[in-house]
Curated annotation (Swiss-Prot):
This is Envelope glycoprotein H. InterPro entries: Herpes_gH, Herpes_glycoH_C, Herpes_glycoH_C_sf. It is found in: Virion membrane; Host cell membrane; Host endosome membrane. The heterodimer glycoprotein H-glycoprotein L is required for the fusion of viral and plasma membranes leading to virus entry into the host cell. Following initial binding to host receptor, membrane fusion is mediated by the fusion machinery composed of gB and the heterodimer gH/gL. May also be involved in the fusion between the virion envelope and the outer nuclear membrane during virion morphogenesis. The heterodimer gH/gL targets also host EPHA2 to promote viral entry. It comes from Epstein-Barr virus (strain AG876) (HHV-4). GO terms for biological process: fusion of virus membrane with host plasma membrane; symbiont entry into host cell.
Amino acid sequence: MQLLCVFCLVLLWEVGAASLSEVKLHLDIEGHASHYTIPWTELMAKVPGLSPEALWREANVTEDLASMLNRYKLIYKTSGTLGIALAEPVDIPAVSEGSMQVDASKVHPGVISGLNSPACMLSAPLEKQLFYYIGTMLPNTRPHSYVFYQLRCHLSYVALSINGDKFQYTGAMTSKFLMGTYKRVTEKGDEHVLSLIFGKTKDLPDLRGPFSYPSLTSAQSGDYSLVIVTTFVHYANFHNYFVPNLKDMFSRAVTMTAASYARYVLQKLVLLEMKGGCREPELDTETLTTMFEVSVAFFKVGHAVGETGNGCVDLRWLAKSFFELTVLKDIIGICYGATVKGMQSYGLERLAAVLMATVKMEELGHLTTEKQEYALRLATVGYPKAGVYSGLIGGATSVLLSAYNRHPLFQPLHTVMRETLFIGSHVVLRELRLNVTTQGPNLALYQLLSTALCSALEIGEVLRGLALGTESGLFSPCYLSLRFDLTRDKLLSMAPQEAMLDQAAVSNAVDGFLGRLSLEREDRDAWHLPAYKCVDRLDKVLMIIPLINVTFIISSDREVRGSALYEASTTYLSSSLFLSPVIMNKCSQGAVAGEPRQIPKIQNFTRTQKSCIFCGFALLSYDEKEGLETTTYITSQEVQNSILSSNYFDFDNLHVHYLLLTTNGTVMEIAGLYEERAHVVLAIILYFIAFALGIFLVHKIVMFFL
C-alpha cells in the first residue's frame, strides 16, 4: 500500500504579524481522501516547543527534483534483499498464576516475601526506566539526513571509541529498533559513516522521499529486517576492512533469546580479550561485528520488554537477562572502555536487593541449584542497591563450598556446576574491582576453594574449551584462584593431546589462559589477604593457601617474612620450593623468618574414617620436575574420607610428594599410609596360621600312632 501524505501549513495574518493558527491535513490513501484540521494551540500543548519554521525546513518540500535525484544516487542500495525463513522464539515466558505484580517505580521492602514467591514487573514503568534518556536517535547529519527525518526520543545507547576519536561506534536503541553507527576519520580528515538498523519492519523509522526500505534492506525474515544506511563512497571505504556475514548476524539476532544472545556475545568478548584484542583492538570484521552484536544484546532485552505492551514481565526472566547484560557491560568497559547509558532499571535493582535481604546468605549453598542461580543473579543485578557487600560474597562462598564438598576430587567441573559458579563469581569480581572488600574470611575461603578446584584435569578442560571456542573456556575457578605458578610450558604440558585439537589452537588457548591469569587484573590481586603485607615480591609467589589462623605462602625464594620457613630442597630437584606460614597474619620482624627448616617425613600416616582429624588442613602435591600440582582443602569428613579412600596418593611414583599443611603452621610430608585396622587384619592372619598349624600337628600326631 502506497501512502501519500501532504501537509498544508496555512498562515493567517493578524495585525501585520504572521502567526500559525491551525494545521490542515489532507490524507490520500489509495484514492480515499480524508481532511483534518488541528488547532495549533492544541498541537503545541501536546508537543511543547515545536517550531513551525523548523518543521518547514525539515520537511524540505521545496526541494527540486534534481537535488532529490542527486541525494538518491549518493545513498548505497543493496543488490537485493536476502529473504530467510527463521523461527522467532518466544522469549519472555508466561507469568505464573498468582504472581505478584510489581511497579518498577514503587518498590519497597516487603513488596515480595521471598525467593519462592512468583513475581513479575509491570512492563510500562519498566520500559520507561530502561529508556529514560532523551537524545537524538536520527541526527541531522549526512548520510542520515538524506534518508531520515530528525528524531529525538527516549533511548539507550552503547558508545565506544578506538584510536582516540578516530574510530567511534554508537549503538542507539529504542524499544522498537536499533541503529548501530560506525564513524571513522581517516588520516586526511575524511569522515566515513555506515549504519546498520535492526528491528521489526513495521516499526522502523519513516523515510524521506524518494527512499523505500526494500532498496536498503539486506536481510528480512517474517517481522524483522536488517538495513544498511550509508553512501556508495563510504560503503566502499568500509568494505576494505569490514565484510560482515549479514546472514549469520541477522539469523542469530532473530532466532536466539535475549539471554542466550547476550551469552553468545559475552563468550566472543572473553575469547577476544584472551587473545589480546582488548589491548590492541584491530579494525577488522570480527571486531566491528562484535561491536554491533553487543548493542543487539542490549536491544533484544529492551525490545522484549517493550513487546509485552501493558503486560507483566516474569522476574526470573529479568534476573537472567539483566545478569547477562551486567556481565556484558563489565567486560566491554574493561575491554573497550565502552559507555552504556540506559538499559538500567533502578526499580529492578531495588527489587533484587529487597529480595536478597530476605535470604540467609550463609545458607545459600543448601538451596537447589535453580534457586542458587536465581539468588546469585539477583545479587549481581541488585548489587548497586545492596548496601551491605560482605553478605553477598558470603552467599557466593556458601554456594562454592557446597559445590566443592560434592565435587569428585580432581575432576573438571561439569556443565551445570560450572554455570552456577560462573554466576556466583561475578558477585566476587564486582567487590574486587570496586575495592570494597574488607579483610574478611569469606573472600579468603572463596579463593582457597577456587585454588583447590584448579586441578590439572580442570585446566585441561578449560584449554580444550578455549581451543574449540566452547563455553567451558568461559569460566574456571582457576581465574579466581591463588595459583601463580602456571607458566606457558606448564600449561602446554597440561593441555589435552587429542587429534581433533589443532596445535595452533591449543597454543592460542594457552596464551589466552595466561592472559586471563595476568597479575595486572584486579581479580588476581591478593591485596585483601592480611598476609599480603609479608610479601615483598608477588612475582616470586607460586601459590597462597589461606587456612584458619595461618596463611601459607609458597614461593621460589625465601624473601617472605613469615612466622617460619620450610624448604623442600632435599627432594625438589628442578628449583627451590619454600613454604612460609604466616600465623595470625603476623609477619616476622626480620627480613626473613630465619634459616629454613627441613620438612619432616611421616612414613606411616594413619588412615582413619571415624572422625575428621584433618578438617581445616590442606594437602599440597608437587612433582620434582613439573613443580606444584594441586592443593586440596579438607572441609569435612566426607572430603577427608574421599581422599583417604581414593587413589589420591601415588607412593609408587617417587617423584611426586605430598605435604600436609596444618592450622598451627606445621608442614609434614606424607610418605606412606598406615591402615588403622591393620593390626586387626594381622591378628586374624596370625590366628588362621596358628589354627592351620594346630590342625597340621594334630594330623601328624594321629598319623604317628596309626
